[in-house]
């Protein structure tokens, strides 16, 4: 079957779902960025956006997020989940804009859910307080996670699971992004989900390093 036929069928049935976006980053790349950044290591790329995050206003973020939502609507997308940075660099500007954009999304009949992005980690007390504040206020629909942003992925995930359980939220975790057999974050995430009793409420995002492992290891992780 032609995959585009399948896609068209889903759109006619009500639309498709974009379960992983970063709308606060939409329309922020420049041609110079593409020339200077494209070959940098992933961790370096996480810091490239800091300049924009410091200088952008809430209005800038709102404009970009709503433009991205409009674009998704044009592609026949029914629901979107976007990670939004919440950290001492961007402060509350991006999350405030995303909250405002929920009204825009509702007016245009497209679902919009927010996940926090822990780009500066969660072990930092300031970062943790900022994220928990917005969880307490009901601004975050899904607890987002980036274990590699912290010195201890184990401690990072323990905090993430405690927050998710406290506020009864699903978890979406960026894991194993480097296509490197030294990474075993997907396995760690699965073990933490079982340890915390949060099975069925956790999504592993990327997990491309699994493909760099031997078949027997991959099958062990698949079976967890």
Which functions belong to the PLM regions below?
Residues 33, 51-140, 149-162:
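Active-site loop-helix segments enriched in His/Asp/Glu that coordinate
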Residues 26-61, 134, 139, 167, ...:
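Active-site gating loops and adjacent loop-to-helix segments of metal-dependent hydrolytic enzymes
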Residues 13-15, 71, 169:
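Residue-level marker of motif borders
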Residues 6-7, 12, 132-133, 193-194:
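Short, flexible, glycine/charge-rich loop motifs used to bind or transfer phosphoryl groups or to couple energy/partner
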Residues 15-21, 80-82, 110-117, 141-145, ...:
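Hydrophobic faces of well-ordered beta-strands that scaffold small-molecule active sites
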Residues 26, 81-82, 180:
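Generic hydrophobic alpha-helical membrane-span motif
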Residues 120-124, 137-224:
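Active-site core of metal-dependent hydrolases
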């Amino acid at each position: 079957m032609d995959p585009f036929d399948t896609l068209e069928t889903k759109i006619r049935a009500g639309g498709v779902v974009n379960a992983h976006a970063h709308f606060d980053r939409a329309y922020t790349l420049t041609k110079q960025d593409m020339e200077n950044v494209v070959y940098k290591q992933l961790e370096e790329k996480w810091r490239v956006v800091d300049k924009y995050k410091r200088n952008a206003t809430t209005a800038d973020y709102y404009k970009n997020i709503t433009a991205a939502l409009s674009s998704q609507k044009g592609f026949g997308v029914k629901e979107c989940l976007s990670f939004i940075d919440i950290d001492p660099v961007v402060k509350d500007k991006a999350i405030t804009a995303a909250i405002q954009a929920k009204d825009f999304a509702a007016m245009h009949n497209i679902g919009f859910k927010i996940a926090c992005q822990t780009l500066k980690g969660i072990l930092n007390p300031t970062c943790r307080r900022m994220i928990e504040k917005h969880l307490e206020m009901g601004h975050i629909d899904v607890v987002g996670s980036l274990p590699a942003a912290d010195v201890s992925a184990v401690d990072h995930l323990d905090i993430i699971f405690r927050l998710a359980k406290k506020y009864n939220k699903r978890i979406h975790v960026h894991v194993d992004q480097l296509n490197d057999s030294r990474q075993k974050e997907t396995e760690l995430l699965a073990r933490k989900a079982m340890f915390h009793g949060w099975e069925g409420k956790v999504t592993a995002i990327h997990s491309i390093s699994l493909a760099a492992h031997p078949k027997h290891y991959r099958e062990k992780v698949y079976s967890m």
